[in-house]
Amino acid sequence: FAIASTCSSSEFGTSYFQETNPIKLFSDCSGYNQIATTPAQFPRMLQGALQHAILKKEVAVLGIPGDLAASQPEENPTATFALPSRAIYRPLDSELQKFAELINSSERITIYCGIGAKEAHTEIIKFASMIKAPIGYSFKAKMAIQYDNPYEIGMTGLLGFPSAYTSMHESDLLILLGTDFPYEAFMPKECKIVQIDIRPERIGRRAKIDLGLGGDVKDTLQALFPLIYEKENDDFLQKQLKIYGKLKEKMAALADKKGSEKNIAP
C-alpha cells in the first residue's frame, strides 16, 4: 500500500513544479488506484485501499495532494475495520477425486510451491512424505517453504538450481501449489500437470494443465489426504535429493575458496 503525494489540487493541470498524476503513474502496477481531493473522500478511499491490499493481495495506491495533507480530517461514515472471517475454499469432492487418482497412479511426482502456499507448510511436508515427492519452490516462497523441510530441492528459474528443474522434467506428475511462476520455458512439456490456485483465472497461463483446481492450498490438501494412499517407493525422491545435495556441496566449495591473499574472497 502506497500513499503517493502530489502538488496542491489548485495546481492540477498547470504543469506545476513536480506536478504528477498518480493515476497514470501507477495504473499498470496496481489493483486499487485513486486520488483523494477532499477531506471527506480520504478516509473512505483509505479504507478501500487497505481492503484491496489485505484481502485481495493487490497493490493499492492512494494519491494525496499537498493541500489535502494539510487539511483537517473528517470522520469516516463507513467501516474502518472490515476483515471477513476465514472461509474454507477448496474444490468439489468430485474434482478432488480426480486429483487423487492422478496421484495414486503416478510414480515420479514433484511438488512446486509459490507464495500462495505459504500458510500450508505443515500440510505440504505431510503431502510430500505421503507421496514421496521432492519439493521445489519459487523465490517468493523460499522463506515459507524451505525451513524444516527434508524434501526440498531448491528453486528453479533464473535464480534457481538445476535440481528443481531436473526433478520437474523427470516427473510423470507435476503439482503446482499457489504459484504463478512466470517462466514458461522452465516448465516441462511431457508430464501431466495439476495446478491449485486461490485465483482460478491464473490457472493454465504458464503451462498446459491437465487438471486445474481453484482453492486455498491448505484447505485443498487437508481434504485430499483421506483420498490418497502413502507410497512406499522413494527411489525418485532419493535421486532428486542426491542431485540437490551434490549441487549444494559444489556451491559451498566455491564460497569457501579463499583465493589469493590480496584478492577479494571468494
Regions found by a protein language model. Give the residues of each.
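Anionic-ligand anchoring segments at beta-strand to alpha-helix junctions in alpha/beta enzyme folds, i.e.
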Residues: 91-92, 98-170
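A short, gly/pro- and small-residue-rich
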Residues: 126-133, 184-202
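Acidic, glycine-rich active-site loops and adjacent beta-strand->loop/helix elements
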Residues: 4-10, 140-144, 180-181, 199-200
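Phosphate/pyrophosphate-binding active-site segments
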Residues: 40, 63, 75-76, 87, ...
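Glycine-rich beta-alpha junction loops
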Residues: 7, 64-70, 115-117, 141
